[in-house]
Design a protein with these regions (language model features):
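Short coil-to-helix leader/linker segments, especially the first N-terminal amphipathic alpha-helix
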Residues: 1-16
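Active-site catalytic motif of lipid deacylating hydrolases and related acyltransferases
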Residues: 2-3, 18-91
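Short coil/turn segments at beta-strand junctions that form active-site/ligand-binding loops
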Residues: 25-26, 89-93, 116-118, 184
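Structural recognition of the beta-strand scaffold that forms the well-ordered cores
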Residues: 30, 59, 95, 121-122, ...
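The conserved beta1-alpha1 loop
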Residues: 31-33, 98-99, 124, 224
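A conserved amphipathic alpha-helix that caps or lines the catalytic cleft of carbohydrate-
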Residues: 47, 108-110
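Gly/Ala-rich beta-loop-alpha elbow adjacent to hydrolase catalytic centers
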Residues: 96-101, 105
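Helical cap/lid subdomain of alpha/beta-hydrolase-fold lipid enzymes
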Residues: 110-260
Length: 260
């Protein structure tokens, strides 16, 4: 497994499995979901996106400069140019948006849709936002539900909350979400944390994912532990429903699309 990373002005690229000697014909481009420092500090998390040696992977992370709507829009332009260069090198390109990355995918789609070798996939996308992008909303829900140790839970949540523009973007009723136009040709996965997925996570010692199931039930998210089903849903007939938490939705969804 080969790790390389390249810096752009508004995002950072982590190349995985990219080897000129292999000449892989397919590539997965994962749009920004986290800031680059998250991946720098958690190389293990990058490995979780890899499931096939015959595919190249390019994981993108926000740069800290994406702190305003203006810079967010500049990042979109930069990613558009980047993807147009990438698809020249591969027979098939999967542009994947997980969580807030799905919003980015919607904003990029109209500019890239003419390229027939690109497949657009959204997973666990908060089209209507999520309370976890708003500390006050989380605090209010904890109080309403009278969750035990709610102060400790809130303090832990607040430590990992970035609060930068990408988080503000997916707050419920944000201006950006109102501007997003969804196209039904984007493959949309809706994830629901179920008891069976919880048991599977427990047996595989996936504590983080199992915890999301408990959070989903305790806070009545009614979704994947982070995003409600209502917020993820775009097209009732075409949406693909999967049993998974927010953390596990990518690997389950992408294996249904990529033909190995």
């Amino acid at each position: 497994m080969i790790y390389k990373n390249n810096d752009f002005k508004f995002f950072k690229e982590f190349k995985v499995n990219v080897d000129s000697k292999k000449n892989n014909e397919e590539v997965i481009i994962k749009l920004p979901e986290y800031f680059d420092h998250f991946y720098d500090e958690n190389i293990k998390r990058i490995k979780e996106y890899i499931f096939c040696k015959k595919i190249d992977y390019r994981i993108l992370g926000f740069k800290s400069s994406v702190n305003t709507k203006e810079n967010f829009c500049k990042m979109l332009e930069e990613i558009e140019i980047y993807i147009k260069e990438i698809y020249k090198k591969y027979k098939k390109v999967y542009v994947v948006g997980i969580s807030k990355g799905g919003i980015i995918n919607c904003l990029l789609y109209n500019k890239l849709m003419k390229n027939s070798n690109i497949k657009f996939i959204n997973i666990s996308t908060p089209y209507k936002g999520t309370i976890f992008a708003d500390p006050e909303a989380v605090k209010k829900r904890l109080e309403e539900r009278k969750i035990p140790f709610r102060r400790s839970i809130y303090n832990t949540y607040f430590k990992i909350y970035d609060g930068n523009f990408p988080d503000q973007m997916i707050q419920q009723n944000s201006d950006i979400l109102k501007e997003v136009k969804y196209n039904s040709k984007i493959i949309n996965f809706v994830a629901k944390a179920t008891f069976s997925s919880f048991l599977k996570d427990l047996f595989s010692l996936n504590v983080e994912s199992a915890f999301l199931y408990l959070i989903d039930k305790a806070l009545r998210i009614k979704g994947d532990g982070i995003v409600s089903i209502d917020s993820q849903t775009r097209n009732y007939k075409k949406d693909i429903k999967i049993k998974a938490t927010h953390k596990m939705s990518y690997i389950i969804a992408i294996k249904k699309i990529v033909i190995l």
